């Protein structure tokens, strides 16, 4: 079976390295970009199955980049990886087409679940983001 292809977007190289190590055994990580505009360009060119992106990035934030991609007909599933626990960010990410909203503090336990859910068109939100434990 072919591995799902993932593109990462985060402006912290150390975090990109950790995410890659976490995802690589199960998925094909195509690469990483460090800002929202580069994400839009790379997603158009590479057509990944899933985008794992940070909310707060330079040039174009993750929410705006997701909106732009969806408006252009991008079919990639979107999983946000973030430090923001504010419900307004969660709502904005879901409204922008996100199927996953993962706390960076729970990345090791939640990210694989979120990607799997996104690939099957289901929403996954880290329990800490919804006030659960």
Please tell me what each predicted stretch does.
Residues 90-95, 99-133:
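Short, flexible helix-to-coil linker/hinge segments that flank and couple to helix-turn-helix
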Residues 9-10, 33, 51:
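Conserved sequence signature across two-component system core domains
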Residues 54, 82:
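Active-site residues of response regulator receiver
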Residues 57:
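Receiver (REC) domain active-site loop signature in two-component systems and cognate sites
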Residues 13-31:
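Two-component/phosphorelay signaling modules centered on CheY-like receiver
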Residues 46-52:
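Active-site beta3 strand of CheY-like receiver
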Residues 44-46, 68-75, 96:
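Conserved phosphotransfer cores of two-component systems
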Residues 35-38, 61-64:
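Acidic catalytic/metal-coordinating carboxylates
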């Amino acid at each position: 079976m072919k591995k799902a292809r993932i593109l990462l977007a985060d402006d912290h190289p150390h975090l990109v390295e950790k995410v890659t190590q976490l995802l690589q055994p199960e998925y094909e990580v195509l690469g990483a970009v460090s800002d929202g505009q580069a994400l839009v360009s790379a997603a158009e060119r590479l057509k990944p199955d899933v985008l794992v992106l940070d909310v707060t990035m330079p040039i174009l934030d993750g929410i705006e980049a997701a909106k732009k991609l969806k408006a252009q007909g991008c079919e990639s599933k979107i999983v946000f990886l973030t430090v923001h626990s504010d419900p307004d960010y969660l709502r904005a990410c879901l409204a922008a087409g996100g199927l996953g909203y993962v706390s960076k503090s729970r990345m090791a336990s939640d990210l694989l679940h979120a990607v799997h859910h996104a690939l099957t068109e289901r929403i996954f939100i880290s329990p800490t983001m919804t006030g659960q434990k």
